[in-house]
Regions:
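Alpha-helical scaffold domains
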Residues: 1-233
Length: 233
């Protein structure tokens, strides 16, 4: 097991055991022993304070992977969000992604610098989508969902995500989430893909399910999408 970092005592001081029990139920890929139980607002606050008060220790922490505890990984992501330059933020992210082992860490950190440098970030996303690591792929799709379905949208992104072939549940769920959000934000561009029924039955049907659960999609469209569900084996 990796050595505990210097920040573990701080995390233990913020421990909320019932919250840890709750988090464990949501993250079946982790053992309970790896979850301290710290709420996200407390972790974000700690990341901001540590960046200001202990920059050298933060730098050491960001260069030391892997970590022991789930909350160390969450803190790692939030510390990357505090980095002031794009080059450092992307370098730290590149180093961190292979060590992400669950959806919760994957989905909770997203440096604002990536939004300010969409073209540069996109070149990295293209590589992440080709990764053998499922959570690296999921992270790349997640950035396309959050940062590239409005002003920076390009229809080629739909094709890129559609081309991803994976047996990983957490990859396919993110693909479905992406296309459901794309239906809400870029309906005209996304609908032909759903109509083509070329996605796997799991992704196709989950996309339609999530779209039908969305408050941003009209009831008329929700009913219309039902005809494109695929039979499951």
């Amino acid at each position: 097991m990796p050595q505990e970092s210097a920040f573990v005592p701080l995390l233990l001081a913020l421990q909320d055991i019932p919250y840890g029990d709750f988090a464990y139920k949501l993250i079946p890929t982790l053992s309970r022993e790896r979850i301290i139980g710290v709420r996200l607002p407390a972790l974000r606050k700690a990341a901001k304070e540590l960046t200001k008060q202990q920059p050298e220790e933060v730098a050491r922490f960001l260069h030391t992977l892997p970590h022991c505890y789930h909350e160390e990984n969450l803190l790692h992501g939030f510390l990357i969000e505090q980095v002031k330059t794009f080059d450092k933020a992307i370098a730290y992210t590149e180093a961190f992604l292979p060590h992400i082992d669950n959806w919760a860490v994957c989905d909770t950190f997203s440096p604002k610098l990536f939004q300010k440098h969409p073209k540069e970030t996109y070149t990295h996303i293209l590589q992440w989508l080709k990764s053998p690591q499922p959570y690296t792929i999921r992270y790349g799709i997640g950035l396309l969902l959050s940062n590239y379905l409005d002003d920076y949208f390009d229809s080629e992104m739909l094709s890129l995500v559609a081309s991803i072939q994976s047996d990983e549940y957490y990859v396919n769920m993110m693909i479905a989430w992406y296309f459901a959000t794309a239906l809400a934000k870029q309906y005209e561009a996304t609908l032909p893909l759903i109509q083509s029924q070329t996605l796997s039955s799991f992704v196709q049907n989950k996309t339609i399910q999530k779209a039908r659960e969305s408050r941003r999609i009209s009831q008329e469209v929700k009913d219309f999408l039902l005809q494109y569900k695929l039979p499951t084996i």
